[in-house]
Amino acid sequence: MNVHEFQAKSLFAQFGVPVPRGKEITSPDAATAWANELNTPVFVVKAQIHAGGRGKAGGVKITKDKAAVAGLAKELIGKTLVTHQTGPKGRQVHRLLIEEGANIAKELYLSLLVDRDTGWPTFIASTEGGMEIEEVAAHTPEKIIKEAIDPAVGFQGYNGRNVAFALGLQSLEPAVINPFVKMLGNLYRLFMEKNAALVEINPLIITKEKTLIALDGKVSFDDNGLFKHEDVQKMRDLNEEEPLEIEAVANNLNYVKLDGNIGCMVNGAGLAMATMDVIKLAGSEPANFLDVGGGATKETVAAGFRILLKDPNVKGIFINIFGGIVRCERIAHGVIEAAKEVKISVPLVVRLQGTNAEEGRKLLAESGLKLDVANDLWEAAQKIVKLTGNAA
C-alpha cells in the first residue's frame, strides 16, 4: 500500500526524522490560511498523487509571494497530472502539500528496503540526490552505496557511520554525521515497526545551516502486515488506486491492470507471468495479471470474468490453468457457470493441464459455450492472439 508524501512525512516526524513544516491542503482558502500561518520566505506547493515525476509534470510550484499561494492551489487542485508513472490518462489532484522552502547545500538519496538476494533490510544511498535512482544505477552504478542490516541484531551505529563515510560526509559536512547516523536508526525503526516495504527520501538535503531535512518522502507498506496497523490503514486513499484492483482484493483475487488487450485468468503467480510472456511472444499484449489462486471456485472465476470484462481494452480472454491443488474439472464447472452469469462478448480460449484435465476439457466441449479449448500453451496463445486480430 502506498501513501501520499504528506503522510510519509508525518510518519517521518513521528520517528524523529527532520522534515519541513508543511500541511495537507484541499482548497484555496485553506491554502491562504496556512500560508499566513507558515509565514516563510519560500513556499512550496506540491500536488499529492501516488506517482513520481510530479515536478516535470508541473505538479510542484515554488513562490516567494504569500499572496500567490492560493492561486497556485487553485491551479493544481482538480488538475490531471501525466507523468512517466501515471500512464497516459494521468492522475487527478485532490490534495496538496504546502510547506516551507529550504536552503539546499547538497542533495543526497536514501532509501531502505528488503534486499531480495539476502532477505535483509538494506539501506541504499547515493550522492546523486534528486535524480531517478534507477538512472543512477544504470549509468553510474559505482555511485550506489548499500548497507545491509542483520535483522537478528538490528541497526547499529557502525551501520550508519559506514553509510555516512561512504557518502563522503566527513568531507561534505562533518557536522551532520552524528545526526545522519541517528536518522538512519530512526528510519530503520519506522521500517520495522510499521511493516514497511520501502522507505525513501529523495532528496535528503544538507542545508546551508548544516542540518538534514527530508525534502521529499515516500513510504510503501507490506499489505500482509496492514492488519496490525490501524493507523496505516486509515491512510489509504482509494482515489489513487485502480478500481478494478480494489474489486479484485474484495474477491480475494490478485489482479494488476496493464495496458494490453488480452485478459488473462491463471492460477499461480509464476504461471501468470509465463502466460503474459507467451502472449507477448505471440504478438499481442496482456491486459492484466490475474491470479485466481489454488482454491479457485465458481464464485472466484465469475468474479474474475466480471473484472476482466469491465476493462474496455479487453478484446479476448485467455484462461490458463494447471491443475495441481485445484482440479481442472472444478475450473471447467466454474467457467461454465460463470459464463451463464456473466455475458462473455469477446473470444475465449481455455487451456487446462494437470489433474482431471481431460474431464475438464470434455465438460467445456459439451457445454455449448462459444470458446476454444487448447492443450498446448503456445497453441493457446496463438489462438487468442489470432481471434483478437493481433497475430504477429
Task: Please place each PLM-identified region on the residue numbering.
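Short amphipathic alpha-helix used as the core "switch/output" element in two-component signaling
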Residues: 336-337
